[in-house]
Amino acid sequence: MSDTPNSDKVACGRKPMFCEIIKLANRKRLILDTTGERVYDARINYCSTADATVQADCHIYWRLKLRRTDAVFEEYTGQGYALDTASYPQQYADIIRGYYSKHVSSALAANTQHFVNVLAMLRHAGACIAHYCMTGKIDFDILSKKKHKNKEVVTLSSADSLSFLPHSALYLPSALRASDPEIFNVLYLLGCACDASIAMDNIANTSGAAKYAMPHYNPLQLSHALHVTIFYMLGLMDSCGYGEDAVLALTAGLHSVTTVIAHSDEGAITRDALRELSYTQPYGTMPVPIAGYFQHINVLFTTQPAWDQFAGIWDYVILATAALVHLSDPGMTVNDVTYPTTLTTKVASVDGRNSDIAAQMMHSATRFCDIYIENLCLFWGVVANPDGNASQALLHAFNVVACGTEPNRHLEMNVMAPWYWVESSALFSDYSQFRSPISSAGYGPQSIYGARLVLAATNSLEFTGEAGDYSAYRFEWTTMRHNPLFNILNKRVGDGLANVDFRLRPFNEWLLEGQPSRRSCDAVGHGTPTATCNHKTPNRNTVDEFIWGSTSCDLFHPAELTSYTAVCVRFRNYLSEADGDVRVLNTPTREVIEGNVVTRCDGIRCLDSNKRIQHVPEVARRYCMMARYLQARTFGALTIGDDIIRGFDKVDKVVKMHKSNNRLGQMPLIDVTGLCQPMIETSTARASMTTRIDPNRLAAATARIELPLAPRCTSSLIPSSDAVPEPEPHVGEPGNGSGCA
């Protein structure tokens, strides 16, 4: 068997990646009135290896909703991406020659290449299956866009023996109907929806017109037939060397009907691009399928799967194809350090469109599309063709989004991190096969289903000293994502991020920090119980006031709270009161901070409510000093040149999943059998402890020394923050010293 596209011998035994994990969400799914909406919840446990009492559970909520009830009936125009070079391999050509010999001379059939294109049918099949999952409705009208009743079919039984089917005909031979009537009938309906010129060997003549009479199917039978037909068409296109075009068309169809709510606003730009994909009319001969091309596609082991089980399969597929956007971020290199792709501009938006951001997004999309298509092929179990056109088709769709007549709200900001649609953690049982430059740099998934993942608790850091109630560290920060310990502090009661601050350095050296309105608010009574704004407590400038605070995903966005220079962080260990009482805050010890964190997923479940994820985080997306720093490093006179954003020369295909830790070596993946049982919180030190000391000695100890500050730079290429020119404040914004909030 060969894995070469369009080889003479068709390689069988391919296995889509959705087969192993689909049993996770086994709770009953609901249909609410005329709209379909579901929320899936994954619980991920983070636990310190140095102290098992330092642990917390984080939740990821994936929300799917029906785009609109008539989305599946979207008008087919026949315009779009054209594919004219997909020819069958010899093994299929030999089968097809037997069909044509009945209608053409043997010599003509033997010397003819047989081409096929069912991309439009695959896109509509994806739309139909998504519609069924969200509404529970599927019938002949949906599959054919109400065109099957009036469709005239060309019959070949009475044709001239020397006649030959035109290149544009969709030929459904009788051999296929005898072999698999389910596939035959669904192909006919999908061909009707896509205005194909359908030809058959012989059918009944009704009222003087050749029309095909469909046998009866109930919805359960029809859904199974559609499921099997999808993989039949994928197999045909993959055997011709165009499997990547096929899986892209199918993915576009799935997301044309369902809306996966993004975990970041601009991350949904990929959804917009997928919806712009369209294809020309289908054609080709549909041969009897070669047995075993795909393995285990009938994961329900029944020909009439229950709607609840069937929806679970394809809900997962929809989520997984959206999560691949995160894994496919090509990244960017700043001072030899890889960061998530972040685009910045000081150009203002005009009529809801920022042309500079759109241009930068298109440049980054060139590399993103190549990686995304490669990962999509791996997920579906088809061969990625290095000479294929799928990435160019997707790139063209991005261009339509960026340059279309209608403004796109995802492109109207001054700072954006485009390649993060939804969180990918816990959605796959194996990430190592994917091509993911962003994961190799440590911004990828933080949990693998069915295994434990060991991560460094914090990014490379240096302990710089203690003074009074505090201990200080110098972090090679990069982003919040690089510090899994903060996931524990954010979700653990009693010693959270409110005891961590950045007061040793200015507060304006951040990109994409959260809750900016709090720090810039000047409302009457701000920070008091009588405030006219929503800020009833005073600003503390602690870490919890800089994060996004998203309720749909407890994990930090890969680009959340980005810094391109080192950061000094204070951890408050004690709370000293005026009367001499000292409360132990139970802040993580140095061993915990410098140690490791083990993560595991306890499963995915389907919820019946989305009330807990209605909050939308507030994120600063204006051009600030750190954005100026990024552009200076990108387009300045540095030796690293344009590879920071434009070339990506320093980011390449890698096999390891996470960046090596300077203290502990390569972070291993530890496999376990079956599900890990959830840990029980055993800490007995949650209650505040009080110790009586001499207030005078406490004051003297606090004032005796200043916390030492480690040097900010590790390279002569990295200037201090003072060397970076600040942008001029916008009209109505505070001046210097107020940060980018």
Swiss-Prot record:
The keyword Disulfide bond does not apply. GO terms for cellular component: T=2 icosahedral viral capsid. It is found in: Virion. Keywords: Capsid protein, T=2 icosahedral capsid protein, Virion. Residues 716-741 are annotated as: Disordered. Belongs to the totivirus major capsid protein family. Capsid protein self-assembles to form an icosahedral capsid with a T=2 symmetry, 35 nm in diameter, and consisting of 60 capsid proteins asymmetric dimers. The capsid encapsulates the genomic dsRNA and the polymerase and remains intact following cell entry to protect the dsRNA from degradation and to prevent unfavorable antiviral responses in the host cell during all the replication cycle of the virus. Nascent transcripts are transcribed within the structural confines of the virion and are extruded into the cytoplasm. This is Major capsid protein. It comes from Leishmania RNA virus 1 - 1 (isolate Leishmania guyanensis) (LRV-1-1).
